[in-house]
Amino acid sequence: CARRVAVGAVAKGYAAGAVAAALPTGMVLSLGGNVCVTGPKPDGSPWVIGVQNPDGDDTEYVQRLDITSGAVVTSGDYQRYYTVDGVAYHHIIDPDTGWPARHYRSVTVICADSGLADALSTAAFIMDEESGRILLETYGAEALWVYADGSASWTGGCDAYFHS
């Protein structure tokens, strides 16, 4: 019996972090739901990173974040999915059920390391919010959860990033 290891939950984040590490200070690298910031803008101000509204188009945001360095990574159910008999099935599978996780529309994680942010956003997407908060606190990361009804919740440290 052949065994396979799927690294999709961290591969893009790891790759983004590796590329960002080679960039000069003050750059933004965006690979879809993985964004790395290597320092503030040349004028010293933060970069504004949008958290996409899962029900909107690419220009609609649930929140905008002021980021001077680190990673912002989103896992969601609204871009990579297929439809069977009118039911959408996305790619983030809950290992307890074997079916796509249905807690949220998206989870966005903010932390220093892109690979870690990628892994945490996927893990938090599968977990209930309370368990996700405990996991994120362990790694010093922040997160924003978007629910199917459009409501959102976030860790306390996110307030410092919210663009005014």
Locate the predicted segments by residue.
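Mature catalytic core of soluble alpha/beta enzymes
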Residues: 1-164
